Amino acid sequence: MGQDQTKQQIEKGLQLYQSNQTEKALQVWMKVLEKGSDLVGRFRVLGCLVTAHSEMGRYKEMLKFAVVQIDTARGLEDADFLLESYLNLARSNEKLCEFHKTISYCKTCLGLPGTRAGAQLGGQVSLSMGNAFLGLSLFQKALESFEKALRYAHNNDDTMLECRVCCSLGSFYAQVKDYEKALFFPCKAAELVNDYGKGWSLKYRAMSQYHMAVAYRLLGHLGSAMECCEESMKIALQHGDRPLQALCLLCFADIHRSRGDLETAFPRYDSAMSIMTEIGNRLGQVHVLLGVAKCWMARKVQDKALDAIEKAQDLAEEVGNKLSQLKLHCLSESIYRSKGLQRELRTHVVRFHECVEETELYCGLCGESIGERNSRLQALPCSHIFHLRCLQNNGTRSCPNCRRSSMKPGFV
C-alpha cells in the first residue's frame, strides 16, 4: 500500500469513526496496519487506533498500540514522532491508573530536545501529568501542572486543550472541596464548547456536562445535577463512550444517594462497577465502592459497609490514591467508634492523620484541614492552597509551606 493510498484509507477510517461506525473504522485502520509499508502512514494509523480504543475504554488495547507506535517512531528517527508516541504511552497508563508510569513518560516527553510538536503537545503533556498527580492525591503538583497546561492553551489559542484543562480543574476543586470553583471551571469549559466547539467532537460537551453534574450534586442542586448528567449520558450512549457511561452511572447513583433513594442508587452503582471493572478503571471502582459503603452506613448495615470499604482500600492502595484512603479510614473510624472497638478505631485514626500529612490537606496558615467541608480556597503562585479567608486576614508576603520546606535540615 503506497503513501497516497495509506492517506486515503486513514481518511476513510476517520469519516467512518466520526459517523459512529466505529467497528468499520477499526477494520479499515487495521488493514492499513497489516498492508502499509510507509512508516509515517503506520505511525498516523496507530495514533488513530490509540484514540479510538481510548474512547471505547479498551485501555489495554490502547496501551498495546501505543507501544507499537513508539517502535515505529524510533524507526522514523524523528523527535516529533517520538514525543507524540510517548504522550500516547503516558495517556494509556493514565487510563489504566498506572500514575507513576504516566509521570515518568511525561517527564521523558518534557526531556526530549526542542521539537515542533513540543510547542503543540507540551500542554497536553502537562495535562496528562496533572491528571496523574491528581490520581496520586499530590495536589500541589497537580495544580502546578494544570496551570502550566492552561498557560500553553492560552499562549497557543488552543481552546480544545483549555476545555480539557478546565474539566480537570473542576475535578481538582471537587476533591479539595471548593465547590464554587468545582462548578466554575466546567461551566467555563461548557462556554468554550458553545463559543468555539461547532466542529469539535461532542465528547467535549459531554465531558463538561458531566463535571458540572458532579459539582451541582456536591452543592446540593440535585435537579441541575440530574439534567447535566442526563445530557452527558445521552452523548456517551450515542458515541459508545464506555468510560463516560460508567462515570455518569456513578454520578446518577450519587445523586439518588444524596436524595436518600438508596433503592435506586444501588443498581446504578452495580452498573457503574461492571463497566469500571470491564475497562480497568480501578480508581473509578474505588469511588463506586465508597458510594456503596455510604449507602450501607445509611441503612446501618455496618458489616456490608466494612466489606465495601475493605475492597476499596485494597484498590486505593494499589493505585496510590491517598485521598480515597483518607476517606475510607474516616468511614472505618466512624463504624468502629459506634461498635466501641478501640484498637481498630485507633489504627484508623492514626492512618487517617498520616494520609492528611501525606496529601498536605491542611491550611499552612490556620493549621485546619482542607477538604473536610466546602470552603473557598486560593492557590499562591507556588500552587500551595490555603483558605481564602486566611490569606485575606494574613496577607501573602510569602508561602508559609514553602518557607517551612526550605527550613527543613538537609541530609549531611
Swiss-Prot record:
Pfam family, any one: TPR_8
GO-annotated biological processes: establishment of protein localization to postsynaptic membrane; motor neuron apoptotic process; neuromuscular junction development; neurotransmitter receptor localization to postsynaptic specialization membrane; positive regulation of motor neuron apoptotic process; positive regulation of neuromuscular synaptic transmission; regulation of postsynaptic membrane organization; skeletal muscle acetylcholine-gated channel clustering
Keywords from the UniProt entry: Cell membrane, Cytoplasm, Cytoskeleton, Lipoprotein, Membrane, Metal-binding, Myristate, Phosphoprotein, Postsynaptic cell membrane, Repeat, Synapse, TPR repeat, Ubl conjugation, Zinc, Zinc-finger
InterPro entries: Postsynaptic (IPR001237), Postsynaptic_CS (IPR018293), RAPsyn (IPR052480), Rapsyn_myristoylation/link_N (IPR019568), TPR-like_helical_dom_sf (IPR011990), TPR_rpt (IPR019734), Znf_RING (IPR001841), Znf_RING/FYVE/PHD (IPR013083)
PTM field: Ubiquitinated by the BCR(KLHL8) complex, leading to its degradation.
Modification Phosphoserine, positions: 405
Mode of membrane association: Peripheral membrane protein
Protein name per the record: 43 kDa receptor-associated protein of the synapse
Originating organism: Mus musculus (Mouse)
Organismal lineage: Eukaryota, Metazoa, Chordata, Craniata, Vertebrata
